[in-house]
Amino acid sequence: AATQKVLTDNGVAPYDSKEMNEALGLIKGLVDDGSIHPDTINISAPEARELFAQGQAAFLCQGMWCVSQWDANYPDLNYGVMAVPVPDGVTNTYVQAGELSPWMGIYKQSKHPKEAAEYLMALYDEQYGYQQSNVESGSFVSCIPEINEKYMTNEHMKQYYTIAEETSRVVPTLVKRDEKANDFYAEVKDVQPSLGAIVQGIISQSITDYDSALKTLANDTTTEWKRASEAVGMDYSSLEFPNWDATKDYTDADYETLK
């Protein structure tokens, strides 16, 4: 499950899948052979960017937001952008992409919805220049493809954008399928230790039996998702997308076939 993207596989939370175990096994291997920076657990994202820029790390798993920061603070930094690495011989691997949409919306109980709408229209209007300036500087990718195509001049951002287009696929989202999804997300409680906590445990070497930890997380999370679904009156089966092919974008037509 990603942020606001709870999905099930055959009715259960898929945290203990073969692929998840292999991913955590890879992380453990990197820890065991000394590949992971010893300060990884204790530093913030900005601090990690600094370590990379100062030559203390050869590879950094972060996002496009690093580009503008390095251009501003380390204009002579010689670096490149690459796709997420995969094991030798593995093909058809992709990263998830949300639907191309703005990151802000209007609160349904807003006292000034008209003014809010006008603000958002201006914010995403090419003439306003906000989208244009951020794309040109390499700060982020616009949700408007035409603006990206017209104003993306930063070479590192171009590399990122090309790789993202080739290696990402739109995944199904519960919010688009069920009107009670937001109520569900408001109700559901985090299960601990979370996946992030388990990964941190592997890196800090406080967790060695990650297989058992993943099984516990999957079982407890499934129980919690069922509880939250019942609490808000949402059909638990809405979390299952049996027609999802992870190698393809999930489309409106795919949602329609589930009705």
For the regions a language model picked out, list residue spans one by one.
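Stable alpha-helical elements in mature extracytoplasmic
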Residues: A23-I27, A48, C66, H112-A116, ...
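Extracytoplasmic/periplasmic solute-binding protein
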Residues: A1-A13, K28, A57, G233-Y236
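Alpha-to-beta junction loops
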Residues: A53-G63, P75-L77
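Short helix-initiation/N-cap motifs at beta->coil->alpha
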Residues: T40-A53
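Conserved N-terminal structural module of periplasmic/extracytoplasmic solute-binding proteins
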Residues: I207, D211-K259
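Beta->alpha turn/N-cap motifs
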Residues: A45, Q62-V67, P85, S101-P102
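Glycine-centered hinge/linker elements that transmit conformational signals in sensory
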Residues: D9-I41, V84
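C-terminal lobe and pocket-closing loops
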Residues: C66-D76, D88-G98, G105-A197, Y236-S238, ...
